[in-house]
Amino acid sequence: AKVKETTGIVGLXVVPNAREVLINLYRKTLEEIKAVP
C-alpha cells in the first residue's frame, strides 16, 4: 500500500511541497527499517 502512495505522490509533480513530502516519506521509511530487527 505504501508503494502505491509513493507512486501517487510522484505522479503529482506539480505539488509545490513535493520535496517536503518525499523527505517525510523517506524519514518514515527509515524509521520503519530501523524498527525491523
Curated annotation (Swiss-Prot):
Keyword vocabulary terms for this entry: Electron transport, Membrane, Mitochondrion, Mitochondrion inner membrane, Respiratory chain, Transport
InterPro entries registered for this protein in UniProt: NDUFA5
Function text: Accessory subunit of the mitochondrial membrane respiratory chain NADH dehydrogenase (Complex I), that is believed not to be involved in catalysis. Complex I functions in the transfer of electrons from NADH to the respiratory chain. The immediate electron acceptor for the enzyme is believed to be ubiquinone.
Membership in a protein family: Belongs to the complex I NDUFA5 subunit family.
Listed GO biological process terms: respiratory electron transport chain
Assembly and interaction partners: Complex I is composed of about 45 different subunits.
Pfam family, one: ETC_C1_NDUFA5
Organism: Solanum tuberosum (Potato)
One GO cellular component term noted in the UniProt record for this chain: mitochondrial inner membrane
Protein's name in the database: NADH dehydrogenase [ubiquinone] 1 alpha subcomplex subunit 5
Signal sequence, renumbered to the chain: none
Domain of life: Eukaryota
